[in-house]
Regions:
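Eukaryote-biased RCC1-like beta-propeller repeat architecture
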Residues: 1-195, 208-213
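Extracytoplasmic soluble-region selector
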Residues: 186-255
């Protein structure tokens, strides 16, 4: 866990097997300050790596680096926050499971690390050890990374997603992993279909549009008794048979 103080200092606690808390010990059960002669404006913690954005627009990375998620040109883990050379004028950062996405002041996105699910958004499945421009979108305002997927917002309000479809970007038309950013729109939501399928113990995000009622089916025949629920019943309710009825337009999870 990383904490950012109002004075621009960073505190870290937790598992440190790969150096992700910048502590010499294997783990720490209390928050300790990360010694860095910089003022930090933003922080982001991935699965086992950490990213810091200074008030100068530079970034420091440390922790697990087998996939290249630190963006420093190699695959070596480090417990020392290290400035990424050649990277400046950054305004936003986001660390996913094994990928890091950054947003520059000229509204361009760059990515590094694991790309097995297309999470770098560069059109290939090749991992990167240096930050690489995502060339198919621009004029970006913010970025947020999930486990193996990412979502970004443009200044015009459009939302784009890419990466792992089955564990993240489940309201795009292709219904497969996407290696480039794909625009998310209401016309691609689950609520515009007559049914969706859930495996037992799985969940999916649904977007309720004016087409309010549709059915949910669970695939695993080993289970005789199914139960269904939605996270936000103000958006949608679900009965024992799996029929979801929307209450108002919005987004919720069904499982």
């Amino acid at each position: 866990t990383l904490l950012l103080t109002t004075s621009g200092k960073v505190l870290a606690s937790g598992l440190n097997v790969y150096g992700q808390t910048s502590n010499a010990e294997g783990k720490t059960n209390k928050f300790e300050e990360i010694k860095l002669n910089e003022l930090i404006g933003k922080i982001s913690a991935g699965d086992n790596h950490s990213v810091l954005l200074t008030t100068k627009g530079e970034i420091y990375t440390f922790g697990y680096n087998v996939k290249g998620q630190l963006g420093n040109g190699n695959n070596k883990n480090t417990n020392i926050p290290t400035k990424v050379s050649g990277i400046r004028d950054i305004m936003d950062i986001s660390a996913g499971k094994n990928q890091t996405i950054i947003l520059s002041s000229n509204k361009i996105l760059y990515s590094t690390g694991s790309n097995e699910q297309g999470e770098l958004g560069i059109g290939t499945d090749e991992n990167k050890v240096l930050f690489t421009q995502i060339k198919t979108i621009d004029n970006m305002m913010s970025i947020s990374s999930g486990n193996t997927y990412n979502v970004a917002i443009r200044y015009d309000g459009e939302v784009y997603a890419w990466g792992d479809y089955y564990h993240g970007i489940q309201n795009i038309k292709t219904k497969t992993n996407s290696r480039i950013p794909v625009k998310i729109g209401n016309d691609s939501s689950y609520a515009n279909e007559k049914e969706i399928t859930l495996n037992v113990n799985s969940s999916k995000q649904i977007e309720i549009t004016p087409k309010y009622t549709f059915n949910v089916f669970k695939e695993d025949e080993m289970y005789n008794d199914f139960s269904y629920e939605t996270i936000n019943e103000e958006i949608a309710k679900v009965n024992a048979k799996g029929t979801i009825t929307g209450q108002k337009v919005g987004t919720t999870w069904v499982k």
